[in-house]
A protein has these predicted regions:
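Intrinsically disordered or highly flexible coil/loop and linker segments, enriched in small
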Residues: 42, 46, 123-134, 163, ...
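Short regulatory alpha-helical segment in sensory/regulatory domains of signaling proteins that mediates
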Residues: 1, 5, 154-162, 167-177
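Active-site-proximal structural scaffolding
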Residues: 1, 26, 114, 143, ...
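Glycine- and acidic
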Residues: 99-107, 150-156
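Helix-to-coil/beta transition segments that act as allosteric "coupling" elements at the rims
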Residues: 56-98, 106
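Signal-transmission linkers at sensory-effector interfaces
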Residues: 127-157, 165
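GAF sensory/regulatory domain recognition
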Residues: 2-59
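Amphipathic alpha-helical "output/dimerization" segments
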Residues: 105-126
């Protein structure tokens, strides 16, 4: 499974399997990733892409050329693993990207579940973005408050020796940030 978040010119993907989670990596808008992106932009809810035989081999050869993912796949082979002879990718779309479910057999009974997971993930990711925005606003408010304390000290300066007090306030405010 993976989730893929759209960026301006490429996307960021987080992938996990029975072997664990890989670090996030960038996916270019090329080949299969372009097809996934375009389907999402057209408003698809679920795209199913089947790879068998030579097409599956070519798919994994391409994935091996990508930074991070390629390294992990090559390590899997070096550790005695192998690529599947066939797989079915299910891209379930949400506002910010898609969830990718990979199966080895058709699973039409799971299609509605994949779509439901995408909707819940959209809610979760929206909450994540809201929290990021709130944290940034809080940080900006802290910076503004610190600047105001330094300004207040500067405005209270009556003689040149008071510059030392301002420098102390500045130091303390920077430490707090």
């Amino acid at each position: 499974c993976a989730f893929n978040i759209y960026g301006e010119n490429e996307s960021t993907e987080w992938f996990s399997s029975e072997m664990g989670t890989m670090p996030r990596y960038k996916t270019p808008r090329k080949k299969i990733f372009l097809r996934y992106y375009e389907a999402g932009q057209k408003g698809e809810l679920l795209l199913i892409e089947e790879f068998t035989g030579k097409a599956c081999v070519a798919h994994y050869e391409y994935l091996c050329t990508l930074p991070v993912m390629g390294k992990a796949l090559k390590q899997m082979i070096a550790d005695g693993g192998s690529f599947p002879e066939q797989q079915i990718d299910h891209a379930a779309y949400f506002k910010y990207g898609y969830l990718l479910f990979i199966t080895l057999e058709p699973c039409p009974q799971a299609h509605d579940i994949f779509k439901r997971f995408a909707k819940v993930f959209e809610q979760t990711f929206t909450r994540f973005l809201d929290l990021q925005k709130s944290e940034a606003q809080t940080r900006e408010a802290q910076i503004e408050a610190s600047l105001e304390r330094v300004r207040t000290q500067a405005m209270a300066m009556h003689k040149s020796d008071d510059l030392l007090n301002i420098s102390k306030v500045l130091y303390e405010e920077l430490k707090m940030l």
